[in-house]
C-alpha cells in the first residue's frame, strides 16, 4: 500500500502545520490513547500520564517528531524508521495492535486542531501514512 503523489503532498502539507506544535499534539494524542484504551498505560508505568505532564509532553513530542521524520522520507520509510523498528521489536515489545489505536487518537487530535485542513482526502492520506508507519515499526516482530 504505497502513498500516491497527492497523498504524499497531503501528508507533507499538514506536517508543516503540525511541526510547530509537535509536543502538544503528541501529548494530546497520548492522553486520548490512555483515556480511551487504558490497557495501553502498561507500557508507560514509569510515566506520569496525568494531563499536562512533562512525560506526556516529552514522549508525545518524540512520537510526533518521528512521524515528521517519516514524512520527510516517504519514499523510504524502512530506512527512515529502521532504528525505531528495532527498538519496538526487540526492546519495547509493544503489542502491534496498539499502533492502530495510537493512529486513531492521532487522527482525532489532528481533526480537532486542523478542522479546515483535515478534510476527507487529508484524513485518508494520514490514515494510510500512519498504517504504513505501523507496518514498518512492526516489520521486525517475530
From Swiss-Prot:
One annotated GO molecular function is: oxygen binding
Pfam families, A to Z? Globin
GO CC annotation, single: hemoglobin complex
Q: InterPro entries this protein is in?
A: Globin, Globin-like_sf, Globin/Proto, Hemoglobin_a-typ, Hemoglobin_oxygen_transport, Hemoglobin_pi
Q: Which PROSITE patterns match?
A: GLOBIN
The superkingdom listed in its UniProt entry is Eukaryota
Q: What residues does heme b bind to?
A: 59, 88
Tissue localization of expression: Red blood cells.
The Globin domain covers which part of the protein?
Answer: 2-142
Q: Which residues form a coiled coil?
A: none
Q: Which UniProt keywords apply?
A: Heme, Iron, Metal-binding, Oxygen transport, Transport
How does this protein assemble? Heterotetramer of two alpha chains and two beta chains.
- Purpose: This is a larval (tadpole) alpha-globin.
Q: Which family does it belong to?
A: Belongs to the globin family.
- Its protein name is Hemoglobin subunit alpha-3
Species per Swiss-Prot/TrEMBL record: Xenopus tropicalis
Please state the gene responsible for encoding this protein.
Answer: hba-l8
Amino acid at each position: 500500500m504505497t502513498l500516491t503523489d497527492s497523498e504524499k503532498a497531503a501528508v507533507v502539507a499538514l506536517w508543516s502545520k503540525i511541526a510547530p506544535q509537535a509536543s502538544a499534539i503528541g501529548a494530546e494524542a497520548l492522553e486520548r490513547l490512555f483515556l480511551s484504551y487504558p490497557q495501553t498505560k502498561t507500557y508507560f508505568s514509569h510515566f506520569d500520564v496525568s494531563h499536562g505532564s512533562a512525560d506526556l509532553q516529552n514522549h508525545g513530542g518524540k512520537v510526533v517528531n518521528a512521524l515528521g521524520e517519516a514524512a520527510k522520507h516517504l519514499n523510504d520509510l524502512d530506512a527512515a524508521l529502521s532504528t525505531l523498528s528495532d527498538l519496538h521489536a526487540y526492546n519495547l515489545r509493544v503489542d502491534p495492535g496498539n499502533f492502530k489505536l495510537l493512529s486513531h487518537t492521532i487522527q482525532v487530535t489532528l481533526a480537532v486542531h486542523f478542522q479546515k485542513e483535515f478534510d476527507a482526502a487529508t484524513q485518508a492520506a494520514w490514515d494510510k501514512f500512519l498504517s504504513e508507519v505501523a507496518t514498518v515499526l512492526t516489520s521486525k516482530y517475530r
